[in-house]
UniProtKB/Swiss-Prot annotation:
EC number: 2.5.1.72
Record localization: Cytoplasm
UniProt xrefs under Pfam families: NadA
The entry's keywords: 4Fe-4S, Cytoplasm, Iron, Iron-sulfur, Metal-binding, Pyridine nucleotide biosynthesis, Transferase
Positions of iminosuccinate binding: H47, S68, Y139, A140, N141, S156, H226, P227, E228, T243
Residues that coordinate or bind [4Fe-4S] cluster: C113, C200, C297
Protein name, per record: Quinolinate synthase
Chief localisation class: cytoplasm
Reaction equations catalysed: iminosuccinate + dihydroxyacetone phosphate = quinolinate + phosphate + 2 H2O + H(+)
Pathway(s) this gene product operates in, as recorded in its UniProt entry: Cofactor biosynthesis; NAD(+) biosynthesis; quinolinate from iminoaspartate: step 1/1
Named cofactor requirement(s): [4Fe-4S] cluster
Gene label: nadA
C-alpha cells in the first residue's frame, strides 16, 4: 500500500457549535417546518450523524433517516418537488446529480467534510494521471468534480464488495480519499491499491489505549467500529461496518452494552431500535490529548432546526447546483454503484 501525500490543510478552522434550543423552541420550530414541508411539497432527508431532533423530524414527516447510500436512493423514489438534505455538502450534491429536475436544498452549504476538503480535484486528478492503468475508485465523501474523475463511486456499505469485484477482474485500483477505509479494504481483499492520504476528523480521533481501558471497564460490551477509524481501532472491534451495518449489528448481537467508534449521532437510531441496550461513545480524548470533534462531526451539527426553517422559507443561497458537464461523468460512476448494489440486494 502506498499513500499520496495530500492531507487536509493545516490550520483549518472548524465551524462553531450551534446554540442549543430549549424544548419549547424545538417544538415551535418543528411545527412550522412541518407546515412548510407540506406547503412546498418538500421532503426531509437526514443522515444518521445529524442531531436527534433532526432525525426525529425526518421520521415524523415521512422523510428518511439513513446512510449516504440510502439517502441517495430515497430522493430518486420520492415524488416531492423539493428535497431538504440534512447532512454535508457531498450528500446534497449527490442528490442533485441523481435528481436534477428537483430542487435540492441544504440547511447550509457550509456543511462540508474533511474527506472532501482533503481531496481537491486538481491534485487528485493529477495523481490519477500518473497511474493511467488503474481504475479510480472514490468514496462518496467527495465533490462532484472528484466523482466525475472516478470510474466507480462507493459508500462504506458497499466498498468492500465493489473492490473485491474489481480485484477479481484483475484491475489495479487508485483509492481515495479515506486512507483508513482504504487500508481496511485492501487488508480484506488483497487488492492492488494505491491510496490518497485523507481521513475523517471524527474517526481519526479515536484513541487506542483509551478504548482498551474502556473495554476493560466494560468487558461484556461489544465494540462496534466504522472502518473510517484507524487500523488499531478496527483491530479491537467485534463488528466493523457502515452506519447501517453497525445499527444492524447492535440489533442482532447478544450484548447488552456496546462501545461505538463512530459519530455519536448514530446513538439516536441505535437507542430507538434497541431500547434495552446501552451505548457508550468510544473515547476521542486521552493519551495526553483532548478531543476536537468529541465524536460528533462539526459540520453535521450545523444542520439545525432554525437553518432548516430558513431554507424552506427562502432557498436562495442554500440551493444545491452542480455543473452539468461534471454531473454527466459523476452520474456514470454513481450509477455503476447503484446497479452493483441492486444486484447485491437480490
Amino acid at each position: 500500500m502506498s499513500l499520496a501525500q495530500t492531507i487536509m490543510p493545516e490550520g483549518y478552522i472548524f465551524p462553531p457549535k450551534p446554540v442549543p434550543l430549549t424544548q419549547n423552541e424545538q417544538g415551535e420550530y418543528k411545527a412550522r417546518i412541518k407546515q412548510l414541508l407540506q406547503e412546498k411539497n418538500a421532503v426531509l432527508v437526514a443522515h444518521y450523524y445529524t442531531d436527534p431532533e433532526i432525525q426525529a423530524l425526518a421520521e415524523e414527516t415521512g422523510g428518511c433517516v439513513a446512510d449516504s447510500l440510502e439517502m441517495a436512493r430515497f430522493g430518486t423514489r420520492h415524488d416531492a418537488d423539493m428535497i431538504i438534505v440534512a447532512g454535508v455538502r457531498f450528500m446534497g450534491e449527490t442528490a442533485k446529480i441523481l435528481t436534477p429536475n428537483k430542487t435540492v436544498v441544504m440547511p447550509t452549504l457550509e456543511a462540508t467534510c474533511s474527506l472532501d476538503i482533503g481531496c481537491p480535484v486538481d491534485e487528485f486528478s493529477a495523481f490519477c494521471d500518473q497511474h493511467p492503468d488503474r481504475t479510480v475508485v472514490v468514496y462518496a465523501n467527495t465533490s462532484t468534480a472528484v466523482k466525475a474523475r472516478a470510474d466507480w463511486i462507493v459508500t462504506s456499505s458497499c466498498a468492500l464488495e465493489i473492490v473485491e469485484h474489481l480485484d477479481e477482474l484483475g484491475e489495479k485500483i487508485i483509492w481515495g480519499p479515506d486512507k483508513h477505509l482504504g487500508s481496511y479494504i485492501q487488508k480484506n481483499t488483497g487488492a492492488d491499491m494505491i491510496m490518497w492520504n485523507g481521513a475523517c476528523i471524527v474517526h481519526d480521533e479515536f484513541k487506542t489505549k483509551a478504548l482498551k481501558d474502556m473495554k476493560a471497564l466494560h468487558p461484556d460490551a461489544g465494540v462496534l467500529v466504522h472502518p473510517e477509524s484507524p487500523e488499531e481501532i478496527v483491530a479491537l472491534a467485534d463488528a466493523v461496518g457502515s452506519t447501517s451495518q453497525l445499527i444492524k449489528a447492535a440489533q442482532t448481537m447478544s450484548n447488552k452494552k456496546f462501545i461505538v467508534a463512530t459519530d455519536r449521532g448514530i446513538f439516536y437510531k441505535m437507542q430507538q431500535l434497541c431500547p434495552d441496550k446501552e451505548f457508550f461513545a468510544a473515547p476521542t480524548a486521552g493519551e495526553g490529548a483532548s478531543c476536537k470533534t468529541c465524536a460528533h462531526c462539526p459540520w453535521m451539527a450545523m444542520n439545525g432546526l432554525k437553518a432548516i426553517e430558513e431554507a424552506l422559507i427562502d432557498p436562495k443561497g442554500k440551493e444545491v447546483f452542480v455543473d452539468m458537464d461534471l454531473r454527466e461523468g459523476a452520474l456514470k460512476s454513481l450509477n455503476r454503484m447503484l446497479d452493483f448494489t441492486a444486484t447485491m440486494a437480490k
